[in-house]
């Protein structure tokens, strides 16, 4: 059944659902997967908008089943296993298998699409042939119990892409939730040296405006306490140096130090909620209030920037 936004359902407050709502409202015809396990309070909206969701607790899947019956809809679920990253997912794999059987045999409106795993997020655990091989073995046990093949064995996100490129992704993994490597293609190269030369790593460009240019000391003058966020900072005394302040801050990109200036001879000193401070002493460019400065982004800064109400987004076709 093709899903369109139900006009009787309020616009969602969850950013993930807001994005899906906007895509459906724009007429995008596709199957949508909710990447975060659903909030019980949003089940009605989720069932109305989303084709498939990641799940890790049977009680929530029962809520989905009841809501699907009420709306006369079908919904697919992927049960998540925790293979050490300690974010979402079943730690007790036997319980996971038993819950999969319950979904398969007792929920007529919910289809068990498959199982999946998350790695490289909270616990910083790398995807490996071992932990993804464990996922495949769990999938086979589920299949034995339900008497059919699972459509999806989802082996993680962009961090698993390196194994795919190397031909080391375990047989049986047939699904990856790729986003960052398609949008940006930076982090795997920057962190692990993965050759991504066949992808463009300069797709998103952040532009910010200079609001002040002065020569100032590099070490704060006065009694040093904590910064605006309650953190103690380390400062390096390099004497008087030329610097620029830009109208951009943590509220826009989260991690100022992860911004990548596209201008040579420029480094990031730091900033605050709505200010970014650059060292421009070694730059050969002309600097003045009103100058527009370009930055490349990594996953973290891209995630914040695309969700910031203070940043306008322009889509260009080449």
Q: Which residue stretches match the model-derived regions?
A:
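Active-site-proximal beta-alpha core segment in soluble small-molecule metabolic enzymes
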Residues: 1-130, 137, 145-146
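Active-site anion/phosphate-binding pocket segments in diverse small-molecule metabolic enzymes
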Residues: 11, 18, 133-318
């Amino acid at each position: 059944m093709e899903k369109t936004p139900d006009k009787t359902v309020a616009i969602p407050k969850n950013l993930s659902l807001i994005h899906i709502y906007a895509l459906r409202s724009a007429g995008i015809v596709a199957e949508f997967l909710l990447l975060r396990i659903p909030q019980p309070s949003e089940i009605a909206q989720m069932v109305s908008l989303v084709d498939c969701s990641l799940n890790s607790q049977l009680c929530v899947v029962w809520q989905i089943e009841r809501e699907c019956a009420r709306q006369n809809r079908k919904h697919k679920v992927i049960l998540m296993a925790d293979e050490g990253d300690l974010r979402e997912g079943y730690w007790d794999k036997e319980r996971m298998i038993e819950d999969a059987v319950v979904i398969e045999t007792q929920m007529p409106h919910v289809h068990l699409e498959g199982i999946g795993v998350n790695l490289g997020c909270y616990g910083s655990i790398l995807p490996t042939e071992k932990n993804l091989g464990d996922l495949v073995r769990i999938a086979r046990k589920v299949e034995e119990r339900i008497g059919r093949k699972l459509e999806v064995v989802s082996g993680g996100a962009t961090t698993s892409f390196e194994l795919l490129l190397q031909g080391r992704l375990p047989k049986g993994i047939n699904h990856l939730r790729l986003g960052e490597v398609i949008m940006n293609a930076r982090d795997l190269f920057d962190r692990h040296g993965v050759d991504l030369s066949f992808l463009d790593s300069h797709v998103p460009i952040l532009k910010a405006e200079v609001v002040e240019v002065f020569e100032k000391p590099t070490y704060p003058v006065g009694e040093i306490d904590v910064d605006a966020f309650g953190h103690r900072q380390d400062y390096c005394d390099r004497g008087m140096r030329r610097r620029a302040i830009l109208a951009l801050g943590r509220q826009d990109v989260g991690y100022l130090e992860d911004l990548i200036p596209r201008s040579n001879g420029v480094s990031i000193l730091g900033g605050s909620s709505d200010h970014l401070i650059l060292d421009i002493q070694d730059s050969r460019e002309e600097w003045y209030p009103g100058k527009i400065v370009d930055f490349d982004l990594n996953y973290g800064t891209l995630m914040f920037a695309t969700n910031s109400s203070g940043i306008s987004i322009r889509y260009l076709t080449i």
